[in-house]
Amino acid sequence: MISTRIVRFHPSTMRRALLGAGLLLGSAGPLMAQADDSVLPQITVTDSADKKKLAEKVSSGALGDRSELETPFSTRAVKSDEIEDRQATSLAEVLKYDASVSNNSPVNGTHPATISVRGLRLDDLNGYKIDGLANINRGTEMPLEMFDQVEVLKGLSGFMYGFGSPGGIINYVTKRPTDDTFFATDLGYASGGTWKEHVDAGGRFGEDQRFGYRVNLVNESGDTEADHGSINRQSIGASFDARLTSDLTVRLDAIYQRRIATGGTDVIVSGFRIPSPLDGTTRLYSNGSFTDVDYRLVTLSADYRLSDDWKASVAVRHSESVRIYKKDQYYITSNSGNYRDRVTSEYHGYEFNEAQAMVQGKVRTGFLQHELVFGAMAQNLLSTSSVNTPKPYIGTGNLYAPTIYSADSVNYSGGTYRDEKTTQTALFASDTMKFDDRWSVLAGVRYTNYIDAAYSTANTTSARFTANRLSPTAAVMYKPRADTTVYVSYAEALEQSASAPTTTVNANQTFAPIKSKQAEVGVKTEHDGWNGSLALFRIERGSQYINSANVYVADGQSVYRGVEANGSLQLTRDLSLDGSVMVMGSEITHAAAAVNGKRAVGAADMQAGAQLSYRVAALPGLQLHAGAQYVGTMALDSANANMLSPYSLFDAGLNYRTRIGGHMTTWSANITNLANRKYWTYYQETYLNVGAPRTLNLNVRADF
């Protein structure tokens, strides 16, 4: 049963607790520094480009844990140190320099942390994982402070994770207990008036250091530069483990977050031209509007080493999220930016339960070395909604001189009801057959039983879809040398179809699952001082779009063809460059005449990103960084009547690491959207959001 109880932390109470250690350091640090100010501290900074990035492990679901170099699909991992250095505060900021990823969400609002990969928006309920297991992403900006890295698997993931968007999978990897005891605290500020306090502590204790812990606490509150909005967030993350024997480790992970935000109004354009972009600080939301999300997750897991070559794992997870919101949507009514303001008040609750067991190992049959994975998974998702969801128009205005109304009188009523239940059970197996040091073949299959039932307010079944499908994957890999992999891969998948948008005649109608196929050819290579990857892909996916009668339909097929390249280069001892580019064409085929041959919505024709990092040798500990992002044209609607203009964004920042009182202290500053560029971001067909304005983030961190 989804709980509607919301735990409330007072920001000032949590702030006092979190800042206690920081204030102690702040007062003691200068005194300690004065006692030894004749000796300059020795600072050693290791740039990420020095590391073998492609050799690091990424989670590959039913394929087990593999390095990026050994994975026959395109992948990307962003570690927590890079997230902290850039002061990234959202999933979109974490992944902005990966050209395959585009942002589909506002800074605030009811749908944060929504992204597309290869032009395909990820499924909020199946496309985002935590440690490879189910996660509720709808309406939730995950607390990045809780995670060691964020991984992107690009392309079809049906075999590896089950139902999901063919664009890919986002996987958050939680911070784990550390072998050495440590305590860190940091204080951050974002322009507009948002303050954040964060504590991170970890270590081990007990006989033979058998027990480990990692705890993160966050408090964030204040006004935001974007939308003239506000945020109030409290997050708690805890990870515990027990090494019960040399072969058996048991883990317990938990995350809680309460996040209240204002802003993030949707601008809906149909039948008129796209308005000129607005300044990102423009307030568009009414008095009384908000988004309140209460999120919690608990996972119990165990890993057991069966032998030197075999291991088993089992995990059970429960997560739930309650999202209550009152939001504005501006329906454009003229080519000069006039609009009607429609307010929706709604309750949404989600409850995920999942269990998974997996065995991985190696065997040899003759000249073949087999890397085997076997597993089973079961999960169910319950969704509840408000019985009466009012959506009145409360006024009119113009985007360039918006009128702020009151939405206090608009409130959902009648309690809540179960509106949908989705169940998946699956069996999966894969075999990576190594013929020699150069050639290997991967074959895998996943059998899924899928049931999706929608319900009316009278608790009767209004729609029901079932599927029993095999999701195969296959790949051939060739290693001309130990540091290079050339691969060809093929995969099929099913995804839960989108419901009809609320702006259509058949609002909220559900559809049968959609089938997708992907073929990919790529190469990955890693050397001292540089690494790179190149992939060519083709994705076929069943289409959903709004037709000329304003009815959302499932019809035809969307085809995506593209090439993406990524690389890192250590230009000098102190200067490094990361770059990424994707060029893609998309087309709707076998569909109604009005959309046949048109570009797929939300898929940019080109994207690029780059980061430059420079260590200042004259001042050890100082590192400068700059970034650039380009997003090309994309279609706002299936008929291609409106096309979003391309835009470029630039960022810059610095980090300075030094010792104060014997403790490493890091000072960080970062500015996003340096030129304060005005731009629109795509959310879904006909929906726009205002792009984020120039924002300054400051932070100081002390490690004990």
Regions found by a protein language model. Name each.
Residues 6, 34, 372, 519, ...:
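Conserved C-terminal beta-signal and adjacent last beta-strands/turns
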Residues 54-68, 72-75, 80, 92-133, ...:
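Extracytoplasmic beta-strand/coil segments of soluble accessory domains associated
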Residues 133-156, 173-174:
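Short acidic/polar hinge/loop motifs at secondary-structure boundaries
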Residues 145-148, 159-236, 244-248, 296, ...:
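Outer-membrane beta-barrel translocator/receptor signature
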Residues 241-243, 350, 369-373, 377-381, ...:
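Structural signature of Gram-negative outer-membrane beta-barrels, strongest in the C-terminal barrel
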Residues 260-274, 380-385, 451, 464, ...:
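Surface-exposed extracellular loop regions of Gram-negative outer-membrane beta-barrel proteins
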Residues 301-317, 321-327, 486-487, 512-570, ...:
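Membrane-embedded beta-barrel scaffold of Gram-negative outer-membrane proteins
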Residues 536-540, 554-638, 675-678, 701:
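Gram-negative outer-membrane beta-barrel transporters
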